[in-house]
Amino acid sequence: MHLGRRNLSQRNRVARMKRKARATVRRCGEAGFSLVEVLVVMLILGIVAAMAIPGWQRIQKNARLNGDAHNIGEALAVAKMRAGANFTYSRVFFFTGTDKTQYFRVDTWNTTLNCWVPDGLPGPLNGNCITTSAVTGYENNLSRGVSGGFGSLSTVPSNFVTSVAQAGGCWGGGTTAMAGSQIADTSCIVFNSRGFPTASGGFYLTDGTRVFAVVTNTMGLMHSYVSDAATASWHAY
């Protein structure tokens, strides 16, 4: 009989301990985080964000400039190929004005219309002749934060060119490829029917931190260079 009472007493103690443990767990779960803990976590997250965001912005900025420089280099390669394949003139038309988004585009000389037309335009008509910097729908816009320019740099990136300057202006309105009048705020590298540039020249792009140059000589060799925007430190890219 005494043994039964002891066993019952032990079971009661165990049951009370279990109930107490469950109550403790519930109280801990209901308590949540204190205000100090929340503030500490927010402070840590703020510090991490402050460290990470500028780096991410630099990556995006570099990617935009790199991408535009690569694309304008590809446009030059396409223009050179078009000129040789079609036995006509071809050019990369680069708009550097500030009244609208800056852009570049490949044009070809149409021997039927005797005017420049956008490359890839099916069945061009007289109304498609390029005489101004108006957009045609075949442009590649420069990325946000990227523009044509070279800052204060004056040292040439290569002996392909003799000065740091955008290539010569684009011709329009003439009866031959290199006649008419030059379109304001434009820069063109033109290839003749043999695929050679009519003159050495280059395109310069900057984001204010770095400058990219894509230059060509009269033999048709093209190279890309990059430099810090503040001090000339050109190296091949």
Predicted ranges, named:
Residues H2-V25, F33-V36, I47-A77, M81, ...:
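N-terminal helix-rich module
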